[in-house]
């Protein structure tokens, strides 16, 4: 069999033609051509597939507790009606009016 020899690749001369050097670009470094990103170690990483997260075992099959929970806020028991100064004053005035009316009706 005949031996096949590969020719060494020649540097791309088209890059130099695309960006002619001018006075503003003479001091700058030439930018690298975009390439495929490589990992730092230089070894190609394996493709990984992500699994869906599953619920903890047994937690979904457990039944809810049998205790009844109230639907809303529990109502507070009504305590004695707190009467302030003005409430007592109104009651006093009502009593006086009632007494006046009774005394007027009894006089007639």
UniProtKB/Swiss-Prot annotation:
Q: Which InterPro entries match?
A: Spermatid_TP
> Which intervals carry biased composition (Basic residues)?
26-56, 73-92
Q: Source taxonomy lineage?
A: Eukaryota, Metazoa, Chordata, Craniata, Vertebrata
Q: Would you tell me the protein name for this molecule?
A: Uncharacterized protein CXorf51A
- Locations of Polar residues compositional bias? 58-70
Q: Show the ranges annotated as biased composition (Basic and acidic residues).
A: 93-108
- Identify the stretch(es) annotated as Disordered: 1-108
């Amino acid at each position: 069999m005949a031996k096949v020899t590969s020719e060494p690749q020649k540097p791309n001369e088209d890059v130099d033609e695309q960006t002619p050097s001018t006075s503003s670009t003479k001091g700058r470094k030439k930018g690298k051509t975009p390439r495929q990103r490589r990992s730092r170690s230089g070894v190609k990483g394996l493709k990984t597939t992500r699994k869906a997260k599953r619920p903890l075992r047994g937690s979904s099959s457990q039944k809810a507790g049998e205790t009844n929970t109230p639907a809303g806020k529990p109502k507070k028991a009504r305590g004695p009606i707190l009467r302030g100064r003005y409430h007592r004053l109104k009651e006093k005035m009502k009593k006086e009016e009632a007494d006046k009316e009774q005394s007027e009706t009894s006089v007639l």
